[in-house]
Each structure stands twice: as structure tokens, then as C-alpha cells.
């Protein structure tokens, strides 16, 4: 259980930093057209970016002691996997499926590999 807790803490720190510095504002502002689905909707992009920013801040905050925050970690997993599913449904090309949806699904589902409560406890309260 302890090594899973440590790995989960590392994941929360790394993915939290990615959320803050890469996924939130960096991608829409720096890469613009290249990584954005078309047609662009800047208001929606910024709203989604702020959600990822907030999630990143909380992930870093709870990384030191993730076990009391099972509900939030379950939310992260479900939110990212369902986000990837919606991206998969609306993907207009193979490139979007392979790059965007796969990355979100992998990063979002990764905690299930070292889920410290045991997979039988996923979404159980």
C-alpha cells in the first residue's frame, strides 16, 4: 500500500504540474491552431483551461497525503476517461483519436495502475 501511495503522490505532482503549465493555458496560447480542434471557440477553450488549472492546483496540494482524498482522485479518473471518450466520439480524424484522446485516456486512467485502495474500491464509498 505504501509504494502505491508514493506512486500516486508522484503522479498527482507530475500531472498537476502538467495541468498547470502545459494543458491549461500553455497549449491554447502557445500552440493555438496546431493543437486545437476546429472550429476554434476561445471562450470554451479558456473555460476548460481554467478547470485543468484548478485540478492541477488541487492535485499538487493533496500529493503529499493522497489517501484521505479518494473522492477527488476518483473524480479525476472518471473526468479524464469520460473526456477522452467524448473526444473519441467527436474526433474528425485518425490524428485526433491517436493523439488527443489517447493522451487524455492514458494520463487520466494511469492512477488505476497504482490505486492504493484496490480496484474493487473504485467508485465505492
Segments the model singles out, each with a brief description of its role:
Residues 105-125:
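Membrane-water interface at the C-terminal end of transmembrane alpha helices
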Residues 10-15, 35-52, 100:
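A loop-to-helix transmembrane entry motif
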Residues 32-38, 61-65:
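Short, hydrophobic transmembrane alpha-helix segments
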Residues 71-88, 105-110:
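Hydrophobic alpha-helical membrane segments
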Residues 1-5, 59-71, 125:
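Juxtamembrane membrane-water interface segments of multi-pass membrane proteins
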